[in-house]
UniProtKB/Swiss-Prot annotation:
[4Fe-4S] cluster 2 binds at residues 55, 58, 63, 73. This is Acetyl-CoA decarbonylase/synthase complex subunit alpha. Heterotetramer of two alpha and two epsilon subunits. The ACDS complex is made up of alpha, epsilon, beta, gamma and delta subunits with a probable stoichiometry of (alpha(2)epsilon(2))(4)-beta(8)-(gamma(1)delta(1))(8). It comes from Methanothrix soehngenii (Methanosaeta concilii). [4Fe-4S] cluster 3 binds at residues 403, 406, 409, 451. The lineage of its organism: Archaea, Methanobacteriati, Methanobacteriota, Stenosarchaea group, Methanomicrobia.
């Protein structure tokens, strides 16, 4: 043969190692799963809440998009909102994927390639990787291919946002859902890399209890705070402290998700290049919402920041209090000089002498060393500055007296704290309002910026709560990591059939509408009702700050298995991927669905059969948007707090449109109208009580058997009676058989069904003659995907 070129690519041996055939969608592109996305968007109507009526993204603008007007490029209001939603979701996706890319390079540089081993009780070891890529990772290097895939998709998605590209709102939403899926894979890559490299727990229900709270940090030692989401530099600080035997001189605490991940290091006892059982020596200072309160309290001597969710004025805040700052990641450099190539001695000297307020050090090893040495050396030098930065009693009273009660602060406060009234009470000697609203304050400092008297309100809070700060000492279970296959085998059937009423996932940030106590209240409500409750990130931290009458935090009250009446701390934000993973495992382990490159099939199973609901009750960031959107694509609904209207979009079902609730019965291909289950994909609740009621409802699934539906309906009605004093208005939509009815309300409900809704009932036999949308049928196999039909009539 002449002029023939033969190219041989990678030799694939996957078929010999996997008992599943390759599914239809390995590495899905932007449009590959568009049909599935449209199924979601057609059932759950997109509702937009634009922040304004104009578009200013190109120089033809500003363009007025009110009514039926279009922009100069031809875009309408719906598409303009869809574009902004996509950009926001992409920001979150990029943050997690870039985090994964940094960890990938760092872990390979520090540890070399390592076998990917999640332990003997986890065989479905990277569910999202397998479901999306259609491959199994064998070593850390294999995650490079997944990162390349994520990065390619991100580029294509962002390109669609350019003026003159995508112009239809439904396709923008499909692209947002695709970005959300990429985000979920990016998170899984992050947590799998650090779990293996840093020997973190692999599904440990009995992960150790670690210390949380500002009061846990020993003020007799130098205190280093590691702030952000990437553990690399903070871990090096811990390793340096351990290797130089400095724990008697320094305390290390974390803020935000770095805090959770530092407490997970080397907890399994496996052979590691890192000192054993290092994690519990770190402490969790608190979630992101406590950051400015911590600074005002002066609890730290040095701060090392990495990436994500770091307040942009961190340097200014610390500089005012002579707290050196070290930027350890190129995503946050704060205008600081790059001292990566300078000697550690020279950098420490400049920081301890306050010649520089901070430095950037992009080598995690050097950053960790400098951070520890600086914290120890600067501690005695900061004592006088710390005293000067804190109010005395007289300064507190004098500052209170300057308030004119103009109430401008209350108008800008996100949780609407009546600050002027609080100050007025304090002038009378009553500090209780300062105490009771301390955990409600989100630490945004808008009040300070708007105050015409320039009152430092957060400093007032610090003085009024100084005893609480000293005694803020609680216990939190360290992040356990993924859900075990053995746990899924135990809960799969009762979860799908409804005997376990659902999985409740508390995730996200610290921008709560009414304080951190709501995290605890929501978690306790559902764990007491027998739900499987999982938590990650800031919500996991914030629910730790409360004790019962026996002095136990929620983590001490309940066990940490993935089971009913248990509560699991899965880990940091990136560990949210394991919640996706648990749902995928129900499909593949319990139902024997092939997950390999079979995303829409798995998502269809989850949406139709796995009772689960997420709540991001403090959502503030673009990462929260990408997390929720990724969860939505895999078929799990999410409830968010009222300020989430700023995200601009919800997915709401219309119960008055029967055509939206038609599904296929896979056993015979017949179309069947179902109850609105789940009723929404993204729901904005106004209050904690409304959120809990909606969460219970969003755990309904068409596959519930009569016992399971009865259990779910009981909790739905109980929550409504407990918080609203009446049965929910729509309970009858979820009744298929008399056996579905809660025993406590059965007679009352049957009368209402007959008298109010016109159902015909055989009272003697206790049967419905007519009325329900469909009968309870244990053989009913709902699906939205035609290829799942087993036999057509």
């Amino acid at each position: 043969m002449k002029n023939v070129q033969i190219n041989i690519g990678a030799v694939v041996k996957e078929e010999d190692e996997w008992d599943q055939e390759m599914g239809p969608f390995p590495k899905p592109g932007v449009a590959t799963l568009r049909d599935w996305d449209f199924k979601i968007c057609n059932r759950y109507k997109i509702m937009y809440s634009p922040a304004d009526d104009t578009c200013t993204l190109c120089t033809y603008g500003p363009c007025d998009l009110t009514g039926n007007k279009k922009g100069a490029c031809g875009i309408d209001m719906a598409a303009a909102c869809g574009k902004i939603v996509l950009v926001a979701v992409l920001m979150g996706t990029c943050a997690h994927t870039a985090h994964g890319r940094h960890l990938y390079h760092w872990c390979l540089d520090k540890f070399g390639d390592m076998p990917f081993d999640m332990g003997s009780e986890i065989l479905v070891d990277a569910p999202l990787y397998r479901t999306i890529l259609g491959k199994k990772p064998k070593s850390l290097k294999d995650f490079g291919e997944a990162l390349e895939y994520c990065e390619e998709e991100i580029v294509q998605l962002l390109a669609a946002c350019h003026t003159g590209q995508e112009g239809h709102y439904m396709d923008f939403e499909s692209k947002s859902l695709h970005s959300g899926m990429i985000d979920s894979l990016g998170k899984e890559i992050c947590d799998m890399l650090q779990t293996v490299a840093y020997d973190m727990p692999r599904g440990a229900a009995d992960a150790p209890l670690v210390e949380i709270g500002m009061g846990t940090l020993d003020q007799n030692k130098g205190v280093l705070i590691a702030y952000g989401h990437n553990l690399a530099a903070g871990a090096e600080a811990m390793i340096y402290t351990e290797e130089h035997n400095l724990w008697d001189k320094v305390d290390i605490g974390g803020v935000c998700c770095t805090a959770i991940d530092l407490t997970r290091i080397t907890e399994t006892g496996r052979e590691s290049k890192i000192p054993a059982n290092l994690g519990p020596k770190a402490k969790v200072a608190g979630a992101m919402g406590w950051w400015r309160k911590m600074v005002r309290a002066g609890i730290m001597d040095t701060v090392i920041v990495d990436e994500q969710c770091v307040f942009c004025d961190v340097l200014e805040d610390c500089q005012q209090r002579h707290i050196p700052v070290i930027a350890s990641n190129d995503k946050i450099m704060l205008g600081l000089p790059d001292r990566t190539n300078d000697s550690a001695d020279a950098i420490v000297e400049d920081l301890v002498s306050f010649k520089m307020p901070g430095v950037a050090i992009l080598d995690p090893v050097k950053a960790g060393e400098v951070a520890i040495r600086t914290a120890v050396a600067v501690k005695p030098k900061r004592e006088q500055y710390k005293k000067e930065s804190l109010f005395t009693e007289q300064q507190f009273k004098d500052t209170l007296a300057t308030c004119t009660e103009c109430n401008q602060c209350a108008f800008v406060c996100p949780p609407h704290i009546r600050i002027s009234e609080m100050i007025s009470e304090a002038l009378k000697g009553n500090l209780e309002p300062f105490s009771s609203t301390y955990e409600v304050c989100v630490g945004c400092q808008r009040c300070e910026q708007t105050c015409p008297q320039e009152i430092p309100i957060l400093k007032l809070y610090e003085y009024a709560n100084r005893e609480y700060i000293r005694n803020q000492k609680f216990k939190m279970r360290a992040g356990r990591g993924p859900v075990l296959d053995t746990e899924i085998r135990k809960v799969g059937a009762p979860l799908v059939l409804g005997q376990i009423p659902g999985v409740i996932a508390l995730v996200g940030c610290s921008n709560y509408p009414n304080g951190t106590k709501e995290c605890y209240d929501i978690a306790k409500e559902f764990v007491d009702r027998g739900y499987i409750v999982v938590a990650t990130g800031c919500m996991a931290m914030d629910m730790s700050l409360y004790k019962d009458e026996d002095g136990k935090t929620i983590w001490e009250q309940y066990e940490g298995a993935f089971d009913g009446r248990n509560i699991c701390n899965i880990g940091s934000c990136v560990a949210n991927a394991h919640i996706h993973g648990a749902a995928i495992k129900v499909a593949t382990i319990f139902a024997h669905r092939n997950e390999r490159a079979n995303y829409d099939d798995i998502a269809d199973y989850i949406m139709s059969k796995v009772g689960a609901c997420g709540v991001a009750w403090g959502a503030y960031s673009q990462k929260a948007a990408s997390i929720a959107t990724g969860v939505n694509r895999i078929g799990i609904p999410v409830v968010v707090q009222p300020s989430s209207v700023i995200y601009r979009r919800t997915f709401m079902g219309r119960t008055d449109k029967p055509e939206d609730w038609m599904v296929i019965d896979a056993k015979n291909g017949n179309m069947q109208q179902i109850e609105p289950a789940p009723e929404a994909m993204l729901y904005i609740a106004e209050t904690k009580e409304e959120a809990m009621l909606e969460m219970a409802k969003l755990c309904f699934r068409p596959s519930d058997n009569t016992q399971g539906r009865g259990i779910k309906l009981t909790h739905y009605c109980d929550i409504s009676m407990k918080y609203f004093g009446k049965l929910p208005d729509d309970w009858h939509l979820f009744v298929r058989d008399v056996k579905d009815l809660p025993l406590n309300y059965q007679t009352q409900m049957m009368k209402e069904l007959e008298e109010k809704h016109g159902w015909k009932i055989d009272w003697k036999a206790k049967k419905f003659i007519s009325g329900p949308l469909r009968p309870a049928d244990v053989s009913f196999d709902p699906t939205n995907i035609p290829r799942k039909i087993r036999a057509k009539k």
